[in-house]
Regions:
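Conserved beta-strand in the GNAT
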Residues: 55, 61-69, 75-82
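Conserved acetyl-CoA-binding loop-helix of GNAT-fold acetyltransferases
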Residues: 83, 89-102
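Active-site rim helix/loop that mediates acceptor-substrate recognition in acyltransferases
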Residues: 28-58, 65-67, 184-187, 191-204, ...
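Conserved active-site alpha-helix within GNAT-family acetyltransferase domains
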Residues: 117-138
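Short amphipathic alpha-helix that is part of the acyltransferase structural core
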Residues: 1-39, 157-184
């Protein structure tokens, strides 16, 4: 939502960043243990120089900051998300997040990932629609969350649709278990009308079927002629078959 009162600055000025560092330092100094994002000042400044800092403005005041980095062409990692203490709990965080998501979508990104820091922010991220990252066998903090930014394939049954099934085990174990996730896909000459995007392990079993006939099955990383084509930033991403 961009208005005179509220908007994001995707190319903030150094003065914007300095303004934010002032209240981040004040917040850090009030904390008995000295916790706070001011301790990440070097990260903030480096990200600003790289063009990876976005500021939220309210009535021309810099009251919010996102620091991010690009994992690859589909995923954005949010390193810092913070709102001025005086403006928390008033809806500004949600406005900021949704505006930034729109910006990321415009840049072609498909998903965001972050670590809930502080832990008290977990409730906010759940409210924003993010999901706790499934255990994919990689080292991730238990408070890692992700959010999908685009419309994806249906998990609700569609008559005559092809089906993609994903197990959270390797192929040799999949014979004895049911798939953990199922998507019903529609495609136009091999390109999915809506893609599939989901956290995964590259060794998990993937099956593509039509009317009960298995068209292809195997590990995600070897599912296409080009190894790891469907595995991006520890996500399964299918836009064509």
């Amino acid at each position: 939502m961009r208005t005179i009162e509220n908007h994001i600055e995707i190319a903030p000025t150094l003065q914007d960043i300095k303004e934010i560092l002032v209240w981040l330092k004040e917040e850090r100094d009030r904390d008995i243990l000295g916790h706070g994002f001011f301790n990440n000042k070097n990260i903030i400044m480096d990200s600003f120089r790289l063009g990876n800092a976005i500021v939220f403005k309210h009535e021309n005041k810099s009251i919010g900051l996102i620091v991010w980095n690009e994992s690859d062409d589909i995923l954005v990692n949010i390193d810092i998300f913070v709102i001025h203490p005086s403006y928390r709990g008033k809806g500004f965080g949600g406005l900021f997040y949704h505006d930034v998501c729109n910006y990321f979508v415009e840049k072609g990104f498909k998903a965001v990932k972050l670590f809930c820091e502080p832990k008290t922010s977990e409730k906010f991220w759940v409210k924003m629609g993010l999901l706790k990252l499934h255990d994919c066998g990689y080292t991730e903090h238990e408070l890692t969350y992700y959010g999908v930014l685009i419309d994806v394939a249906s998990t609700i049954h569609i008559n005559n649709a092809e089906k993609i099934e994903l197990w959270d085990v390797e192929p040799y174990e999949a014979m004895e278990t049911e798939p953990r996730w199922t998507w019903y896909i529609e495609n136009d000459e091999g390109r999915l009308l809506y893609p599939i995007l989901h956290p995964c392990n590259c060794n998990w079993n993937l099956r593509w079927s039509r009317n009960g006939d298995v068209l292809k099955e195997g590990k995600i990383k070897y599912f296409t002629d080009e190894d790891f084509e469907l595995f991006k930033s520890k996500f399964l991403y299918i836009e064509k078959l």
